[in-house]
């Protein structure tokens, strides 16, 4: 088992839209559909979220999120998630960190909270990104990494199994 693990690529797993349901939580917090929320001004969009200092730490699991985490957890995955700029929402980084400590018990040295554009910097031939945002996947692949565009847990697990997991 240990030998096999060394040869498998490192898994980087996104949070929002993969493990936790940001959209559902944002709809609950703002009272508008995610489609409508997307078209609001920056302050209308983020105001109610910023006002709730527990927003990030109390996001619900994504449907299939626990199942996916249970599958990948034995491979010592890293979290690679984007944060909202600290000046804009100072609760984001500590809130996401708390969510991870509470829900997945991932060690701090495997938590990478970065600007969205920095995700591609983690790419190499021995790394996989699981992400629900296609641009992150294409940027990661351009840098030589393996990308799994997350549309469902069953599909992502199928893709991981094809890679030898």
Which residues are covered by each model-predicted region?
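Active-site neighborhood of HAD-like aspartate-dependent phosphohydrolases
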Residues: 5-53, 142, 152
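A general structural motif
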Residues: 6-8, 74-76, 108, 124-126
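Short hydrophobic segments within beta-strands
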Residues: 14, 80-82, 130
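Short catalytic/ligand-binding loop motif for oxyanion handling, primarily in non-cytosolic enzymes
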Residues: 20-23, 28, 77-79, 86-90, ...
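Substrate-recognition element of Asp-dependent hydrolases with the DxDx(T/V) motif
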Residues: 56-61, 65-96, 100
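Donor nucleotide-activated moiety binding/catalytic core segment of transferases
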Residues: 97, 104-129, 133-137
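Acidic, Mg2+-coordinating phosphoryl-transfer loop and its flanking beta/alpha structural elements
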Residues: 124-162
């Amino acid at each position: 088992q240990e030998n096999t693990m060394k040869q498998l690529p490192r898994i980087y797993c996104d949070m929002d839209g993969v493990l936790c349901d940001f959209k559902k939580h944002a709809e609950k917090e703002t009272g508008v559909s995610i489609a409508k929320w997307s078209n609001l001004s920056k302050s209308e969009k983020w105001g109610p979220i910023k006002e709730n200092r527990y927003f990030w730490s109390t996001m619900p699991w994504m449907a299939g999120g626990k199942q996916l985490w249970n599958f990948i957890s034995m491979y010592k995955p890293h979290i690679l998630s984007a944060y909202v700029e600290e000046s804009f929402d100072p609760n984001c980084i500590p809130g996401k960190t708390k969510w991870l400590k509470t829900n997945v018990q991932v060690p701090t040295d495997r938590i990478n909270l970065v600007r969205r554009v920095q995700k591609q910097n983690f790419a190499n031939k021995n790394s996989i990104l699981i992400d629900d945002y296609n641009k992150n996947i294409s940027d990661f692949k351009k840098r030589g990494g393996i990308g799994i565009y997350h549309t469902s847990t069953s599909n992502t697990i199928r893709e991981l199994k094809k890679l030898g997991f």
